[in-house]
Amino acid sequence: MQSARELGLFFTKNGANAVIGHHEHLVQIAELTPNGLCAYCLGNTLGYHGIDQRDEHRLANYSIILHLYLQRRSGGGISSRYSFSIAKCVANDDGHAVCHLLNDLIKSASEDAEREQLLRDQAFIYKRFTGQDIDNINRSAVEFPFPQT
């Protein structure tokens, strides 16, 4: 990951508003640099790998949907704002992978134990992606602002 970090920092230092990498198919930490956002892996919303197994250390069935807002400044240049949503892939009745916003799954959970597990997963993925605890965040939000450091 060190070489990916160095590459991301190089690109943001040289004008990129965001660098989005992808390798492990697992959500990895992102960092807000003075020049832009470096997200090293957003997960895997396209594949089936891992959605039928529970692995507390990987949670391969979770992904990040990154929201990147760019606005041209009147004096030149571009301003950026970043936020994200958490998605979870689950198998439907036909055995096909379907991705849902985690917020929707939490709201529709029929059992308290299921809802509590989804909330624990939400806190885990939030911390894995941002490096920060979710404690003071509106956990029912569909879109989380990327925390400022």
Feature locations, PLM:
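Short N-terminal signal/transit or membrane-insertion segments
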Residues: 1-11, 135-144
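Conserved beta-sheet core of the metallophosphoesterase superfamily
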Residues: 2-64
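A short C-terminal boundary segment appended to hydrolase-like catalytic domains
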Residues: 55-149
